[in-house]
Amino acid sequence: MALFQYQALNAQGKKSQGMQEADSARHARQLLREKGLVPVKIEEQRGEAAPRSGFSLSFGRSHRIASDLALLTRQLATLVAALPLEEALDAVAKQSEKPKLSALMAAVRAKVVEGHSLAEAMGNFPGSFERLYCAMVAAGEASGHLDAVLNRLADYTEQRHEMRSRIQQAMIYPCVLTLVAISVVSILLSAVVPKVVEQFIHMKQALPLSTRLLMSASDAVRTYGPWVVLLLVLAIMGFRVLLRQEKHRLVFHRRLLFLPVVGRVARGLNTARYARTLSILNSSAVPLLQAMRISGDVLTNDYARFRLGQATDAVREGVTLHKALEQTALFPPMMRHMIASERRRARRHVNPRGDNQDREFSAQMTLVLGLFEPLLVVSMAGIVLFIVLAILQPILQLNTLMSM
């Protein structure tokens, strides 16, 4: 969905303005008419499509969004502790230096002025405030501790942003190293090796096996290289199209979770996110079944989300939380034993386990990247060494013949 800024006339002919989420401008006008408003002007706020999943506002890129949301939530938590909610929202809207963020908070404030609760007002913008956010705000309003809940939300958002940034930074060096390695080997085989080997061919000298293998590899790269690249691009595009189908995506995500090394990292990422989300929802007095359902929805792996949905159904039928999580085969034994069947014990133990899961996931990422980087360097060095030896061997043989 997109976010539209509108100006409209109400039944009394007074002008009003605000934000409306809709699939299109036509849909936005229809929604405004259903509210008894006559649209005068509607402008789409670019870059504000609602994400499929994740915990973010919908203006701009995700790594900026998380920090914006954390700052907004922190400011709101500070203000609601000392000011009425309407004044706090007005102050946050005016404080923001980003027009789109300011307009959204003004729209939320307008809903609150109309008589909606803060959670209901934010729920009118699902592309900006997720179910997790709205559920926690609703729990905070019901318990009378909205400021404390908002502070937990800010902490949660910052931790999510920090983990995402850590993963991205950790992946930069291996990706760059891989691209450089492929580029260097391709240039050597397609441009350098043919010119050197051509001199040996003119000498009509019997070439060593390594040199003949190098010549074959060079010919293959020059002849079939562009086709291989084209096939790879087509394969990636086809794979992406295939993953758009739910049944194929579910099978792929299931296999991904149980691969030897990558699977452990993927499971760690998803279980850490689930534990962290369940922790913050439980501590905010959100009902357990609702907390489990929302915690599953924030996961990026479809199979993990499916299995945890089954766990939620099992708990609804009377199975203990410990047993339901055990049946998913996703969580490590220590976590299953730390989470009790009753919500009271879950509220006590999930939070530290969420911290443990974050630490374990970071350790797993460090281990995987620590193994990958030296393996890539050694492989690159081995290939370059083979190329150098394949070129030097005929030269050394030629020098030997000339000395004889």
From Swiss-Prot:
GO cellular component, one term: plasma membrane
Transmembrane spans: 172-192, 223-243, 375-395
Molecular function GO labels: metal ion binding
Family matches, as Gene3D superfamilies: Type II secretion system (T2SS), domain F (1.20.81.30)
Major location category of this protein: membrane
Residue intervals on the Periplasmic side: 193-222, 396-404
Any Pfam family hit: T2SSF
Residues exposed to the Cytoplasmic side: 1-171, 244-374
Keyword annotations from UniProtKB, A to Z: Calcium, Cell inner membrane, Cell membrane, Membrane, Metal-binding, Protein transport, Transmembrane, Transmembrane helix, Transport
Protein's cellular compartments: Cell inner membrane
GO biological process: protein secretion by the type II secretion system
Binding, Ca(2+): 97, 151, 155
Membrane topology listed for this record: Multi-pass membrane protein
Assembly description: Type II secretion system is composed of four main components: the outer membrane complex, the inner membrane complex, the cytoplasmic secretion ATPase and the periplasm-spanning pseudopilus. Homodimer. Interacts with OutE and OutL components.
NCBIfam families recorded: GspF
Purpose of the protein: Component of the type II secretion system inner membrane complex required for the energy-dependent secretion of extracellular factors such as proteases and toxins from the periplasm.
Family indicated by similarity: Belongs to the GSP F family.
Annotated protein name in UniProt: Type II secretion system protein F
Native source species: Dickeya chrysanthemi
